[in-house]
C-alpha cells in the first residue's frame, strides 16, 4: 500500500517523497553510462596571461568541438608552492599539435608553464551522480532536466494504485479466456479521470497489433472524436494523449513504447519488466532518447501480483 503519513498538508494534497514512491524512475542508457573521455590540449599559465590566452582560444574557435561545450574552458588550481595558476582547454588533440600551440603562444608573448594532453568528460552529465563523478575530472556544467522532476500526491498515488489493481484483475480474467495476461489504462491526473482501460486482444481479434496499449490509445482517440463531434461548449481539443499518465501491468514492447511516444504521454508506470522484449528498460530506452522529438518519464518495479508472462512475449 502507498504510505500516507507524509506531509504537513492534508493527506489528499500531501506530496510523497521520492524515497517513498512504490516504484523507481527508469533512467535512460545515457543517464547510466560510465565516464567516457576525450583528449584535449591543456595550457597551464600564470593569471597575468589570462586575457591573451582566452583571446587566442576565441581566435581558433574553428578548431573547437561543440560537443565539448559542457566542459568549462578554464579552471584554477594551486601549484606546488601554493601559487595560483590557470589551466585552459585549447582544443581537441587532433586539431593541433603541442608545437603549433607553443609557436602561437611565443608569437603572442604568452609564457606557458606547460602544454599537455588531458582527458576531459566527453559528454555532459545528465544526473547528479554523473555530475559529481565527472566534475572531479574536469569542471563541467550541469543543469538538471526540468522534465525529470516529478511530483506525486498521496491522493494521486492511491488513485493509480486503485487503477493498477483493477488492471491486474482485468488482465487475469483476460488470460483465462486465452489472451496474454496484461492490461493498460490511460489516466488524466488533472481531472482525476480514467479515459481508457484495455486488455490484450490479439487472440480475440486475430490481429497481431492489438496490444493492450494500442487498444487503449485507440479508445482515447475515439473518445476525443466523439467529444468533438458532440460538444456544445468552447472546450479545447486534446492533442492525442498529451500530458496523460499510462498505467500498465507489464513493460510495453518497442512498438507500444513508440506508440506512447507518438501519443505524447507524460509518464508511464508499470509493474513488471519484459527483459527480452521491452522497449523501456532495454538498450532501446525509447522513453528518453535525445534524438527523438518527445520524451516521457517511466517508472517500474511496483511490487504487485501481476499475471506471469513469458519473457519472449511482446506486451
Curated annotation (Swiss-Prot):
Domain CMP/dCMP-type deaminase, residue spans: 158-299
Location of this chain's protein in the cell: Cytoplasm; Nucleus
Per UniProt, where does Zn(2+) bind?
A: 211, 253, 256
| Predominant location category | cytoplasm
Q: Which UniProt keywords apply?
A: Cytoplasm, Metal-binding, Nucleus, tRNA processing, Zinc
Q: What GO biological process terms does the UniProt entry carry, in alphabetical order?
A: tRNA wobble adenosine to inosine editing
Question: What family classification does the UniProt entry report for this protein?
Answer: Belongs to the cytidine and deoxycytidylate deaminase family. ADAT3 subfamily.
The protein in question is named tRNA-specific adenosine deaminase subunit tad3
